[in-house]
C-alpha cells in the first residue's frame, strides 16, 4: 500500500532511527530482525475505527517507545481471513465468467494491479477445494532434497551444496544513483515476502537522496557482500509459499515469494553486470538467449527458422527437462560464478550456499507448514534464471563443441538442437547424458517436440529416436507443419495463421469477460493497459500485415478490441472516425485501443530490423536470410532472398506510405532494442493517422471544434 504523504516523514524517521543503530552495530542479530519486520509492524492493516494514516502515526510512536506488545498485537489482528470469505461469497455466483470478472475488478480496485487482474480473467473460476496436506505435497514434489535419489537413470543421490569457503573476491557495489533509479522503475504491484515489505514500501525507504537513503545503500551493499550475521541468512532466504489453482479439478501451482531485499539486490546486481552476462552467454558462440539478451526470443526463433530454411531436410528437436529450474545440481554453479563473475560470488553464496525454508499456511492445518529448498533455483529469487543458465552453460558448451555443424541454442531451460536428422538425434542423446551427469536432471521425450519440415516420419524414426506412437506413448512427438518456440510459431504460413487464431481466441474470450466487470472505468483500464498488449509478442514473430494468411484473424481481433469502447459508449456501432480515434494512443487524444491493423506491421518490422542488425555478429551463416530492410530495392529482390525479407519489404512499404518518417527510423535506429523500435514506428504511424483524422473531420465539418 502507498504510505500517505503526511506520515511519510514520520515513517522514514522511525526507519532512520533503526538503520542508524544497525549501522553502528552491523552484527546485531536483534537489530537485523527488527529491520526485517519493520514494515509488518508499522504497515499492518488498520482497524475499522482508524484510518491507515492514523494507524501509522500511532505505531511509529509505539515503535520509538519500544512498546512491542501493542505493535505485535496490531500485526496479528491484521491477519484476517478476508480472502477466504471473499472466495466463499463468489461460490454463490453461477456464471464462471462473472466470477472471473469480479476477481479482476477486485485486483484493480484494491491492489491496483493490472497484471493480477489480467491473470484473474483466465484463472479457474471455482476450482476444487484442496484437502489438508495437498499444499504440503505440492511443495514437496517441487522441491527435491539433497541426499535424495535424483531423476537420473542410476538414481544417484543428490550432491551436497558445497559452497565456496573462505574469503571471496571483492563484491559488487552499488551507488545511491543506481539504487534510486532501480527502485523507481520497479513494479510496485509485485508481491512482498514474509517480512511485509514490498516494492511500494521499499520506494518509501529510498524516497529521496538523503542520509537515510545513503545508509540504506550501505546496508544493501553489505547484503551484496554477504556480510550478514549467520542467524539472519535463513530469515532473508526464507520465502512465503502460495499455491494457485491451475484448473477446475484441483490441480495446484505452488509459487514462492522471496524477501524483497534479496530480490532487489539481486536485480541490481544483474542490471549492473548485464553487459558481461550478455557477452558470457553469446561469445564466442551464441548459446543462451534467456538472460540479458534484448529480443532473445525473437532472435532464437528466427535463427531456428533460418537454419531450417537454408538446410532443407534438417529437423529441430526442442528438449524438455523435467522440473528443470527446481532440480538442477547447485554444485555446478560455484565454479563458473567465481571464474566469470567474481563480484557476484559473495551474494551468490548468501543466496544459494545453504538450505532455504518455504513457509506456508494450509487450510485445516494448525500452524505454519514448511519445506526446505536446497536443490535447483530458489523460487521467488531474482537470480533463479541466471543461476540455472550459468550451471547449464558448461554442458551446453560441451554439446555445441562436440557438434559444431549443428545449431545448438537455449532460452533458459528451452534447449533446441537443429540439424540433419541423424546428427541432431545423436546430439540429443548426448544431451541426455550431459544433462543427467552434470545437472542430475532428466529430459522428457514425451514433452519434447521434433519439428521435421519435409522430412518423413520414417526417416526420423530410422535415426533411432523413440517416436511417439500407439506402441510407444512415451516417445517424442514429431510434427511437420510447425512448432512453438517460446510462444512464437515457427513453420508454414497456414500453421502460423492457425497458431495466431488460437491465441486471438484466448484474448477475445478475456475481452468478453472484461465486459462483465461492474465498473466501466476498470473495464477501460484493464483493456487498454494490459489486454491489448498481449498480442505484441505474437505480432513480433509473424508477418501479421500480410492479408492473405492473416486477414480473418486480424478482423476478428479488431472487432473484439473495438467492441469495448463501443459498449462503454452504449452504442450498437461506432463510426469509422470514432473507431480511428478510439484506437489512437492516449498521448494523441485517443483511448489506446490499438488494433491489429494498426500495429502488425510496426511490431513485425521492429523485430525484423533488430534481427537483421544482430545476425551478422551472432549468426554470420544465417545473416543472408535477414538483410537490412532499407537495402531491399523491390519486392522481386526481397522475394528472391527469403520469405522474411519479402514480408519486411512489404511491411516497410505499407508503413512508409502512411508515415514517411519510418524509413529514416529504420536507417538510424537499427541498433536499438525491439521495444524502442516498435514504439518509434507506432508513434510515427499514429501521428500520421491523427493528422489524417483531423483533416477528415475538418473537411466533413469546417466548424468542428477540432478545426480551430
For every predicted segment, state its role.
Residues 1-233, 237-240, 313-315:
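Surface-exposed loop/turn segments and immediately adjacent short secondary-structure elements
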Residues 213-226, 271-273, 300-309, 424-440, ...:
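Inter-domain linker/hinge segments that demarcate the starts of reverse transcriptase
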Residues 162-382, 386, 390-394, 603:
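Conserved pre-catalytic core of RNA-dependent polymerases
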Residues 403, 469-546, 607-614, 618-621:
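Basic, alpha-helical interaction scaffolds
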Residues 39-111, 117-124, 569, 573-708:
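Extended C-terminal regions of large enzymes
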Residues 323-341, 408-411, 415-438, 456:
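Catalytic palm subdomain of template-directed nucleic-acid polymerases
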Residues 193, 238-241, 253, 269, ...:
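Catalytic palm active-site di-aspartate
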Residues 424, 442-481:
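Short, conserved micro-motifs composed of acidic
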Amino acid at each position: 500500500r502507498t504510505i500517505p504523504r503526511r506520515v511519510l516523514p514520520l515513517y522514514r524517521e522511525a526507519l532512520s532511527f533503526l538503520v542508524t543503530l544497525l549501522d553502528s552495530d552491523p552484527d546485531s542479530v536483534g537489530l537485523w530482525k527488527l529491520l526485517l519486520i519493520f514494515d509488518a509492524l508499522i504497515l499492518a492493516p488498520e482497524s475499522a475505527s482508524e484510518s491507515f494514516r492514523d494507524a501509522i502515526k500511532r505505531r511509529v510512536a509505539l515503535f520509538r517507545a519500544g512498546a512491542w506488545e501493542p505493535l505485535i498485537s496490531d500485526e496479528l489482528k491484521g491477519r484476517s481471513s478476508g480472502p477466504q470469505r471473499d472466495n466463499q461469497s463468489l461460490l454463490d455466483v453461477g456464471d464462471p465468467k462473472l466470477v472471473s470478472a469480479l476477481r479482476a475488478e477486485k485486483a484493480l480496485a484494491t491492489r491496483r494491479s493490472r497484471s493480477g487482474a489480467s491473470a484473474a480473467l483466465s484463472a479457474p473460476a471455482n476450482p476444487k477445494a484442496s484437502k489438508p496436506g495437498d499444499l504440503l505435497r505440492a511443495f514437496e514434489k517441487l522441491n527435491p532434497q539433497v541426499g535424495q535419489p535424483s531423476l537420473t537413470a542410476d538414481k544417484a543421490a543428490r550432491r551436497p551444496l558445497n559452497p565456496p569457503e573462505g574469503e571471496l573476491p571483492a563484491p559488487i557495489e552499488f551507488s545511491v544513483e543506481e539504487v534510486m533509479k532501480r527502485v523507481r522503475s520497479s513494479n510496485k504491484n509485485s508481491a512482498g515476502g514474509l517480512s511485509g515489505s514490498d516494492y511500494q514500501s521499499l520506494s518509501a525507504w529510498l524516497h529521496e537522496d538523503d542520509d537515510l537513503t545513503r545508509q540504506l545503500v550501505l546496508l544493501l551493499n553489505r547484503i551484496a557482500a554477504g556480510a550478514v550475521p549467520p542467524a539472519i541468512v535463513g530469515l532473508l532466504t526464507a520465502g512465503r509459499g502460495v499455491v494457485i489453482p491451475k484448473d477446475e479439478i484441483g490441480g495446484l501451482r505452488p509459487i514462492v515469494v522471496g524477501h524483497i531485499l534479496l530480490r532487489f539486490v539481486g536485480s541490481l546486481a544483474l542490471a549492473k553486470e548485464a553487459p558481461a552476462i550478455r557477452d558470457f552467454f553469446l561469445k564466442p558462440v551464441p548459446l543462451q538467449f534467456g538472460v540479458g539478451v534484448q529480443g532473445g526470443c525473437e532472435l532464437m526463433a528466427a535463427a531456428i527458422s533460418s537454419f531450417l530454411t537454408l538446410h532443407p531436410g534438417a529437423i529441430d528437436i526442442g528438449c524438455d527437462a523435467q522440473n528443470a529450474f527446481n532440480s538442477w545440481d547447485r554444485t555446478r554453479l560455484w565454479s563458473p560464478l567465481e571464474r566469470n563473475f567474481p563480484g557476484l560470488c559473495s551474494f551468490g553464496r548468501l543466496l544459494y550456499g545453504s538450505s532455504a525454508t518455504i513457509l506456508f499456511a494450509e487450510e485445516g492445518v494448525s500452524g505454519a507448514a514448511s519445506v526446505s529448498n536446497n536443490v535447483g533455483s530458489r523460487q521467488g529469487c531474482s537470480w533463479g534464471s541466471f543461476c540455472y543458465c550459468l550451471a547449464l552453460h558448461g554442458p551446453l558448451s560441451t554439446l555445441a563443441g562436440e557438434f559444431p555443424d549443428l545449431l545448438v541454442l537455449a532460452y533458459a531451460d528451452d534447449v533446441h538442437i537443429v540439424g540433419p536428422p541423424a546428427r541432431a538425434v545423436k546430439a540429443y542423446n548426448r544431451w541426455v547424458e550431459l544433462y543427467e551427469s552434470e545437472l542430475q536432471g532428466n529430459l522428457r521425450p514425451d514433452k519434447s517436440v521434433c519439428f521435421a519440415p519435409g522430412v518423413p516420419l520414417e526417416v526420423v524414426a530410422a535415426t533411432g529416436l523413440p517416436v511417439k506412437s500407439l506402441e510407444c506413448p512415451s516417445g517424442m512427438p514429431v510434427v511437420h507443419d510447425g512448432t512453438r518456440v517460446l510462444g512464437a510459431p515457427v513453420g508454414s504460413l497456414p500453421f502460423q495463421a492457425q497458431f495466431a487464431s488460437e491465441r486471438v481466441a484466448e484474448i477475445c474470450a478475456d475481452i468478453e469477460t472484461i465486459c462483465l466487470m461492474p465498473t466501466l472505468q476498470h473495464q477501460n483500464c484493464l483493456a487498454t493497459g494490459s489486454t491489448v498488449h498481449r498480442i505484441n509478442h505474437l505480432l513480433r514473430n509473424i508477418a501479421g500485415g500480410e492479408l492473405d494468411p492473416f486477414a480473418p484473424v486480424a478482423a476478428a481481433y479488431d472487432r473484439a478490441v473495438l467492441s469495448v469502447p463501443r459498449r462503454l459508449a452504449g452504442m450498437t456501432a461506432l463510426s469509422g472516425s470514432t473507431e480511428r480515434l478510439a484506437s489512437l494512443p492516449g498521448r494523441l487524444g485517443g483511448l489506446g485501443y490499438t488494433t491489429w491493423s494498426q500495429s502488425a506491421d510496426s511490431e513485425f518490422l521492429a523485430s525484423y530490423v533488430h534481427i537483421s542488425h544482430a545476425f551478422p555478429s551472432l549468426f554470420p551463416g544465417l545473416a543472408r536470410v535477414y538483410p537490412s530492410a532499407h537495402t531491399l530495392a523491390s519486392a522481386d529482390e526481397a522475394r528472391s532472398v527469403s520469405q522474411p525479407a519479402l514480408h519486411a519489404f512489404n511491411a516497410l512499404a505499407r508503413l512508409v506510405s502512411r508515415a514517411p518518417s519510418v524509413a529514416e527510423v529504420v536507417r538510424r535506429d537499427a541498433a536499438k532494442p525491439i521495444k524502442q523500435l516498435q514504439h518509434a514506428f507506432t508513434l510515427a504511424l499514429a501521428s500520421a493517422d491523427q493528422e489524417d483524422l483531423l483533416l477528415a473531420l475538418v473537411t466533413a465539418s469546417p466548424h468542428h471544434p477540432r478545426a480551430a
